[in-house]
Amino acid sequence: MRLLTTVAALRCYLNKRRWESQLTASEEQILDSMTSWYQTAIGLVPTMGSLHQGHLSLIERARHENSTVIVSIFINPLQFGPNEDYGRYPRTLEQDRQLCEQAGVDAIFAPSPEELGIPQKNIQESQVTQVIPPSVMISGLCGHSRLGHFQGVATIVTKLLNLVQPDRAYFGQKDGQQLAVIKRLVADLNLPVEIVACPTVREASGLACSSRNQYLTAPEKQQAAVLYRGLLQAEAAFKAGVRYSSRLREVVRQELAKVSSVLVEYIELVEPTTLMPLDKIQEEGMLAIAARLGSTRLIDNTILRDRQPIIAIDGPAGAGKSTVARQVATKLGLVYLDTGAMYRAVTWLVLQQGIAIDDDCAIAELANNCKIELTPSQDLQSPVRVWINDTDVTQDIRTIEVTSQVSAIAAQAAVREALVKQQQRWGKRGGLVAEGRDIGTHVFPDAEVKIFLTASVGERARRRQQDFQKQGQPEVSLEQLEKDIAERDWKDSTRKVSPLQKAADAVELQTDGLSISDVASQIVDYYQQRLSQW
């Protein structure tokens, strides 16, 4: 692991990593014609140091999803107010270095403020070029008492994204306002990076992990856990049918009042993306708290969603995801969202229009301008009916020609971005079963039930051969199908964009020797078990 403290060293390191990836790709391409896909993604975990379990969970996620992981450690003077704790904020670089090395980080970027051209002054006094988020997003919640804080955050995050140019950057959901601001910043400035939101990590008491928890004594930590208990009370009220902000906030206030040493700064209900205040939850809301315990400021939040559950089913090609997902949706009365059919439809259109598979620009235009419609079939033996640009392609997208090219199309960032947006719009109200390769990790990371279906290559080849026979497709040998499936697995799991992965909180089902009905029944049982816990 490298410790980098200058911009020049960081750029040199990143250039070297990218060159090594390209060199490895070229060598592998000569050795094996199937290795035309490479996981060269860079993941960035921005921190202010004093690392804790929350940071380590971000690093673990980044390590799982990227070939190179960079952790930045920078205590940003721009985001501290004149009377805040910039001077006493914990500085533990050697300890942080050891934790990063143990976690498999490739490099730490720990510059001084001067190295980044930032004077050690707050944002109001600084002459540095600033990034200013929309005022409506930074005037409420923490922005009300921390003037200039989010301008400072936005400025340094933009700097880091520009310097590292990561494919993904990881932030915790505990800082809900910061997360929303950064997502908006990336969208508004068209920055080519995916912002990955990771769940809040908590201590045993429920207190959200924070570097500032070091300021608290052991008794104070127990007292501070009342914030989480207040959120739990609100979640219980929400599940019981309470939707109005005034009532939900009062539930939290009553719980916090039980600990007199906790001084409430705010309890607010806002829309999680825009941060606009909500009177009533129609779809989802973020219930956020800020309070002080002695000289320590604490924040926490929870997302309240008024939607039916989502079941995310991931797994490799030929694992039976589509058939299982349809049966599960039928048994539970949910909508079946065949995301694989969407990618197949785009692939069919690419081939139909004679566009080269590697013409990313033309395919990006096509994916962002096409119209896809899915209509469930009442007959479980028949596939979902699929239209693209008003053409019925239900049968056409299942041909060997489309099957052999769909992974290449699905791996293109512009295609996935266009289709994921549409899938997420469909999933806004929940009540659906979706299957694919990154549903639980990327499309619906907040799905209530996550399943990872898998089977041996031989079993999947046998199933695929039976499918082709039923569809009247030309005969393909098991040996060829096994080779094709192994190649598809490799491509899907090593591609740079949204690779095939098992979500950390997914249940894995090995389906060799099980019928479709057996697998569907297991998922339904698990769903009902989870439902009883909500």
Curated annotation (Swiss-Prot):
UniProt name for this protein: Bifunctional pantoate ligase/cytidylate kinase
Residues binding ATP: 48-55, 172-175, 201, 209-212
Active site, per annotation: 55
Chain residues that bind beta-alanine: 79
Family to which this protein belongs: In the N-terminal section; belongs to the pantothenate synthetase family.
Pfam families noted in UniProt: Cytidylate_kin, Pantoate_ligase
Record localization: Cytoplasm
Origin superkingdom: Bacteria
Ranges for region Pantoate--beta-alanine ligase: 1-302
HAMAP family linked: Cytidyl_kinase_type1, PanC, PanCY
GO cellular component: cytosol
Pathway where it operates: Cofactor biosynthesis; (R)-pantothenate biosynthesis; (R)-pantothenate from (R)-pantoate and beta-alanine: step 1/1
Family annotation (SUPFAM superfamilies): Nucleotidylyl transferase, P-loop containing nucleoside triphosphate hydrolases
Keyword Plastid belongs to the record: no
Keywords, in A-Z order: ATP-binding, Cytoplasm, Kinase, Ligase, Multifunctional enzyme, Nucleotide-binding, Pantothenate biosynthesis, Transferase
Residues the record lists as binding (R)-pantoate: 79, 178
Organism field: Trichormus variabilis (strain ATCC 29413 / PCC 7937)
Summary of the function given for this chain in its UniProt record: Catalyzes the condensation of pantoate with beta-alanine in an ATP-dependent reaction via a pantoyl-adenylate intermediate.
EC annotation from Swiss-Prot or TrEMBL: 6.3.2.1, 2.7.4.25
NCBIfam families membership: cmk, cyt_tran_rel, panC, PRK13477.1
Gene Ontology biological process terms, A to Z: nucleobase-containing small molecule interconversion; pantothenate biosynthetic process; pyrimidine nucleotide metabolic process
Predominant subcellular localization, coarse grouping: cytoplasm
Reaction it catalyzes: (R)-pantoate + beta-alanine + ATP = (R)-pantothenate + AMP + diphosphate + H(+); CMP + ATP = CDP + ADP; dCMP + ATP = dCDP + ADP
GO molecular function: ATP binding; CMP kinase activity; dCMP kinase activity; pantoate-beta-alanine ligase activity
